[in-house]
Every structure is written in C-alpha cells, then in structure tokens.
C-alpha cells in the first residue's frame, strides 16, 4: 500500500545493524509517522565464536549496545530476531551464551531455526557438525525459555485496549486478527469476541479490542 493510505509500516529485512540504526532514527524523529517502532534485527547467534564462524561482521557486544539503545530511546519498542542453532562448531558453551543473550534482551518475538546442511554451503566443509539430536534439544530449551518470556509480556497487555486488524471470522461471534506488533504468519494472533457488544466488525477493517486474557503467543479480548 502507498504510505499515504497504509495504517502502519513494518521494516522486516536488511543489514541488521545498519537498517536498525536508520529505523531507530526515523522512529525517534518521526520522519515517517506510520513507521512502527518494531525492530527486526537478525541476530543469527548470541555466541561470539559462532558469529565469527558464520562470517558475520558484527559482534555480540555491538548487538547488545544496539538493543539497549533502542530500548532507551524508544521504551515501547518491539524487538524481533531470528537465530540458528546447531551451526557447525557450536558448543554447549556457545549455546549457553545464546540462551543467556535471549534471557538478557528478552525479545518480544524470537524465531529459532535448526541448522540445515547442504553440499553447496560453505559451512558444509566445516568441522565439528552438531548431531541432530543435540541441535534439537537446544532448540527445545531456547523455545521453552522464549515461551516464558512471551507469556510474561502478553500478561502485561491484559487490560489494554489495542487496535486489531480483523482477518478471519471464526463463527460464534469470534474473530481472529492482528495487532500492529503481530506480524502475519510468524507471530501469534488476537482473538476478538463481539458476543457482548453490538459493535459491527468486518474482515479487513480495524477494531478496538480490550484484552482480558493472554496465552504464550496469543491475546484474547472483546470489542471495545
């Protein structure tokens, strides 16, 4: 949609540090009024050693400083990242650093992927490939930690009234939609009930919903 008619804009791709800094400047200065304070910084790993093996040009410390700066300058910022577990050479210590990083930063949204090998990848020729079972166990541990973080953050939204883009009629006066901080396909949804209100709700339109319950990734509310 053109900026003049879009309700809000997400930035979801780009060089992690460069794009995030530009994005932060635009949000802080309100250069693009509809640009959301939602920062997708692709972390890849919270281990300095793994980042080097991946050939990344940024460090764990630079990422930490960036996230702290975002939170200081934009208190209501939403932080999103993606990481890869089981990259060749990743040790238990490397994974613990990643787990500690996630606990410290407390991302609003965290996408976790297990390394998938292929003959044409440069990493295919690296030593010390991580056994699939070990990588999966690390995935389970990190996702469990993130689930607790996400649940805590969602609990804080109970009592708030949020704008929700209605996307699906589930029947029985229940609709599913997304708030501005819930990206399509990858995040949770917000369920909106109209049972106790005669307020019309339409697919593709926005509705105000008061949040009265929360799950790990989804919110539950009623039209306000």
Residue ranges and their predicted role:
Residues 39-41, 110, 164, 211:
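OB-fold and OB-like beta-barrel modules that bind single-stranded nucleic acids
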Residues 13, 21-108, 115-134:
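Conserved non-cysteine loop/helix-boundary elements of the Radical SAM core domain that shape
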Residues 5, 39, 104, 190-193:
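Intrinsic disorder/low-complexity segments
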Residues 1-25:
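Long, compositionally biased, helix-prone stretches
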Residues 125-224:
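Terminal RNA-binding accessory module
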Residues 2, 12, 16, 118, ...:
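Generic signature of intrinsically disordered, low-complexity, basic-rich segments
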Residues 4-8, 20, 31, 39, ...:
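Terminal low-complexity, poorly structured segments
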């Amino acid at each position: 949609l053109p900026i003049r008619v879009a309700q809000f804009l997400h930035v979801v791709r780009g060089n992690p540090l460069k794009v995030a800094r530009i994005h932060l400047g635009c949000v802080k200065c309100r250069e693009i009024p509809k640009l959301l304070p939602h920062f997708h910084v692709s972390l890849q790993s919270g281990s300095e050693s793994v980042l080097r093996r991946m050939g990344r040009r940024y460090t764990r410390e630079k990422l930490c400083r960036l996230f702290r700066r975002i939170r200081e300058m934009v208190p209501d910022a939403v932080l999103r990242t993606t990481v890869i577990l089981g990259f060749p050479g990743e040790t238990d210590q490397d994974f613990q650093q990643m787990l500690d990083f996630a606990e410290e930063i407390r991302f609003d949204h965290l996408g976790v992927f297990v390394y998938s090998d292929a003959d044409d990848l440069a990493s295919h020729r690296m030593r010390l490939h991580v056994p699939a079972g070990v990588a999966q166990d690390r995935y389970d541990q990190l996702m469990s930690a993130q689930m607790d973080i996400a649940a805590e953050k969602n609990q804080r939204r109970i009592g708030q009234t949020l704008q929700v883009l209605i996307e699906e009629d589930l029947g029985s006066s229940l609709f599913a939609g997304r708030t501005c901080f819930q990206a399509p396909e990858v995040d949770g949804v917000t369920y909106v009930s109209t049972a106790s209100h005669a307020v019309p709700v339409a697919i593709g339109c926005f509705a105000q919903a008061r949040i009265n319950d929360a799950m790990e990734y989804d919110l539950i509310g009623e039209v306000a």
